[in-house]
Design a protein with these regions (language model features):
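C-terminal PAP-associated
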Residues: 19-523
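Bacterial N-terminal signal peptides
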Residues: 2-13
Length: 523
C-alpha cells in the first residue's frame, strides 16, 4: 500500500479502483517495449550495514522510517540476497544487497522514473538465466497535499546483482488523481521469475498488480493485471486482466458484468517446477461469506497458466476469510487494526509452490475468526492459517493454524525449504497476553505440526512511535502504519532468511518513542 512522509507527517493516499482490456478474454499481443518517460533519477549507494549478532539492522543511512520488506535469495548462490523496503528518508525504495550470507549489506536508493516521483510497494526478483536482478515498484507523482497521482508500475534492472540499478521500465501506466473523470490507480504489484531449469519458461519474469478504476472518485473495479518478460526485463508483454469471472464465486457487483471477479487486491505469484505459474489474490465479491449485507468478507482465489501467462484459468476458490466490515476494530484512519493498537492490518499472505512436486502449493493468510467478530465492538485474536493443494489448486485442505498461541498473529509470509521440504511461515506475534509489543516469529514444519522460533531478539513497540502517530486520546503515539507485509526466503543451502519491520530502536528525537527499521535474521 502507498504511504508518503513529509517531515514526520504521514499522508495515506486513498486507493481508488483499471479498466479491463474488454471482450471475453485477454487478447494475445506481441511483446512491446515500454520505457519510462523523462529523465531517470539515479540510484545512490548510501552505506554498508554489518551484522552485529543474531539480528541485523539493515537501515544504516538515517533515522527515518522504513517498512514493507521483501527478500529474495539467488537460486544459484545462496549467499547472494537482495532485500528492499519503503524508505521515508528519500525519494525511493531502499535496496539491501549481500554477497556473503548476510554478514554485510550494501544499502542505498533505487532508481525511479524522474525526480518528481516517489517509490512504493517494493519487491525484488533475481533472474538466474539472464544474470539480472529486477526490482518492481509503484512510482507516483505527489501533489502538495500528499495526493498520489499517475502511479506507474515500473521495473528497474540491476546487471551486477543489486549493487547498481538502471533506468526503470514502465510495465503498467497509471492515470490521474482521485477526483479526476477517470483515474487508474495501480497498487500492490508483485514480481517473480521462473528459475526452474526444467521449465519451458525458464527465465520468464512475471509482474502482477491491482488496477483500481474510478470515475470522479467513484469506484468502478479493481481487477488483477499481468505482464511478463523473456529477456531479463528489457521487453514486456501488454498488460492483461487475469482475475477472470465466476458466477458462483463473484456474485456481488459494483459496476461490472455479472460474475466478473473484478474487486480484487494483493496478488502474489509462484511457479511450479513444470513451469505452471499461479497467481493468488483476495476478492471481496462472494456474498455467501457475508454474515450481513455488504460486509465484504474476503475470499482467497487462484488462477493459473500452463503456457507462460498467455492464457489463464478461471479463478478457483481457496479459502474464505473472517475479515469483513465488523470483524476488526477500526483505527483513526478508518482501517482495520488490532485491539489496543492503531497499526493497520489485513489478512493478506502469499502462495508458494513446492520446489520438487508439481501442483503442490501452500497459501497463508490471517483473519479474526477466533476473536470477537461480526460485532459493533470486535476484539481480535487474529491467527495465521495455512491451506494446501496437491492438484494445482482444484482442491484445498481446510485452514489450519500455524501458531497455537492465543494472542494476535498477522502479516504471514511463507516459503518452502528446498533441502528438507518443510514449510516456513514468518509472522508478527503479540504473544498470549496481547500486550503493547510484538516479536517476529518463524514457524517451520508441515501443516498441523510446526515448530516456532522467535527470530527477533527484542520486542517492537508500535504504541510509542516517533512516526505515523495516531494522535488520539489514550493512543497519541500509536503508529497507524508499519507496512503491509514482511519477507521470508530459503536458499539452496537450507537457511531461512527473514526480514521484517522492527520498532525496537529508541528515537534520537523524542525520549520514550521508537523508530521503524528493517531487520534481518538468518536461521
Amino acid at each position: 500500500m502507498l504511504t508518503a512522509l513529509a517531515g514526520v507527517g504521514l499522508f495515506l493516499a486513498a486507493s481508488v479502483r483499471a479498466e479491463p482490456p474488454g471482450g471475453d478474454g485477454p487478447e494475445k499481443v506481441p511483446f512491446v517495449r515500454s520505457v519510462a518517460p523523462g529523465a531517470v533519477y539515479n540510484w545512490a549507494f548510501e552505506c554498508t550495514a554489518f551484522s552485529g549478532g543474531l539480528n541485523t539492522n539493515l537501515d544504516c543511512d538515517d533515522p527515518y522510517p522504513n517498512n514493507e520488506p521483501n527478500i529474495v535469495v539467488d537460486r544459484s548462490n545462496p549467499r547472494h540476497m537482495i532485500s528492499s523496503s519503503n524508505d521515508y528518508g528519500s525519494c525511493c525504495d531502499q535496496y539491501y544487497t549481500s554477497f556473503n550470507g548476510g554478514a554485510s549489506w550494501s544499502t542505498g536508493n533505487m532508481s525511479i522514473e524522474d525526480p518528481s516521483r516517489t517509490g512504493s510497494d517494493p519487491v525484488t526478483a533475481i533472474d538466474v538465466k539472464h544474470h539480472v536482478a529486477l526490482h518492481s515498484s509503484l512510482n507516483y507523482n505527489f501533489k502538495d497535499d500528499g495526493e498520489a497521482c499517475d502511479g506507474d508500475v515500473v521495473v528497474s534492472p540491476s546487471p551486477d546483482g543489486g549493487l547498481t540499478w538502471k533506468k526503470p521500465v514502465v510495465v503498467g501506466f497509471g492515470k490521474g488523481c482521485d477526483l479526476d473523470p477517470t483515474q487508474v490507480f495501480n497498487d500492490k504489484e508483485w514480481i517473480a521469475t521462473d528459475n526452474n531449469p526444467h521449465s519451458r519458461f525458464y527465465g520468464r519474469t512475471y509482474v502482477t498488480w491491482t488496477a483500481f478504476l474510478s470515475h470522479s472518485g467513484e469506484f468502478v473495479e479493481s481487477p488483477i493485471m499481468e505482464t511478463h518478460s523473456d529477456d531479463g526485463g528489457k521487453h514486456w508483454s501488454h498488460p492483461q486482466e487475469i482475475s477472470g469471472s465466476s458466477r458462483d464465486l463473484c456474485t456481488y457487483q459494483t459496476a461490472g458484468r455479472q460474475g466478473e471477479c473484478d474487486e480484487d487486491q494483493a496478488s502474489v505469484i509462484t511457479t511450479s517446477p513444470d513451469g505452471t505459474v499461479y497467481v493468488a489474490f483476495m476478492n471481496s465479491q462472494n456474498e455467501s461469506l457475508y454474515e450481513s449485507p455488504a460486509e465484504f468478507d474476503d475470499q482467497y482465489m487462484i488462477v493459473s497458466s500452463k503456457n507462460g501467462g498467455e492464457d489463464w484459468s478461471k479463478p478457483s476458490f481457496v479459502a474464505g476469510m473472517e475479515d469483513g466490515a465488523n470483524d476488526y476494530p477500526i483505527n483513526v484512519d478508518g482501517r482495520q487494526t488490532l485491539t489496543g493498537y492503531q497499526v493497520r492490518v489485513w489478512g493478506a499472505g502469499n502462495v508458494v509452490a513446492s520446489p520438487t512436486q508439481d501442483g503442490k502449493l501452500y497459501l497463508v493468510f490471517s483473519d479474526n475468526r477466533n476473536g470477537v467478530h461480526d460485532s459493533d465492538n470486535p476484539v481480535t485474536n487474529s491467527d495465521v492459517f495455512i491451506v494446501t493443494t496437491f492438484d494445482g489448486g482444484k482442491h484445498w485442505t481446510s485452514p489450519s493454524k500455524v501458531d497455537t498461541g492465543h494472542g494476535d498473529q498477522w502479516f504471514p509470509w511463507a516459503d518452502v525449504n528446498p533441502v528438507n521440504g518443510k514449510v516456513g511461515v514468518l509472522y508478527h506475534d503479540r504473544g498470549n497476553a496481547n500486550g503493547p509489543t510484538y516479536k517476529t516469529a518463524l514457524a517451520e514444519g508441515h501443516p498441523g505440526s510446526f515448530v516456532k522460533t522467535v527470530m527477533s531478539t527484542q520486542p517492537s513497540d508500535p504504541t510509542n512511535s516517533e512516526y505515523f502517530q495516531a494522535g488520539i486520546p489514550g493512543c497519541e503515539f500509536c503508529a497507524v502504519f508499519h507496512g503491509d507485509y514482511i519477507g521470508l526466503a530459503y536458499g539452496s543451502d537450507g537457511h531461512a532468511n527473514a526480514t521484517w519491520t522492527d520498532m525496537r530502536d529508541p528515537s534520537p528525537f523524542t525520549p520514550g518513542l521508537f523508530l521503524q527499521f528493517i531487520y534481518y535474521a538468518r536461521k
